Amino acid sequence: METIAKHCHARSSAQKVRLVADLIRGKKVSQALEVLTYTNKKAAGLVKKVLESAIANAEHNDGADIDDLKVAKIFVDEGPSMKRIMPRAKGRADRILKRTSHITVVVSDR
């Protein structure tokens, strides 16, 4: 049984979160949680929360056994970017893009 958890509009760029997502794709959830716990990146905390939510969803909604679960799919899509302005010299301004991402984790017992 596949169970999904999502975090939309996560305040980190998709490029940075994908680096962390690649670390846990296909692993058992216990091993994936361990990897994320000791990964020293902000994105690891975001992905860990989504993975824990997917595990809780599988246990509560589908009655799955946690020991059998593995990360079947994990993907990160780009979310909307917030546009901000950084004032510069001589009346000019630069545009800053504060990027967001949509993190999706699918856990499965197969």
From Swiss-Prot:
PROSITE patterns: RIBOSOMAL_L22. GO terms for biological process: translation. One of its GO terms (molecular function) is rRNA binding. It comes from the Bacteria. CDD domains: Ribosomal_L22. Pfam families: Ribosomal_L22 (PF00237). Keywords: Ribonucleoprotein, Ribosomal protein, RNA-binding, rRNA-binding. GO terms for cellular component: cytosolic large ribosomal subunit. HAMAP family: Ribosomal_uL22_B (MF_01331_B). Part of the 50S ribosomal subunit. Belongs to the universal ribosomal protein uL22 family. This protein binds specifically to 23S rRNA; its binding is stimulated by other ribosomal proteins, e.g. L4, L17, and L20. It is important during the early stages of 50S assembly. It makes multiple contacts with different domains of the 23S rRNA in the assembled 50S subunit and ribosome. PANTHER family: CHLOROPLAST 50S RIBOSOMAL PROTEIN L22-RELATED, LARGE RIBOSOMAL SUBUNIT PROTEIN UL22M. This is Large ribosomal subunit protein uL22. The gene is rplV.
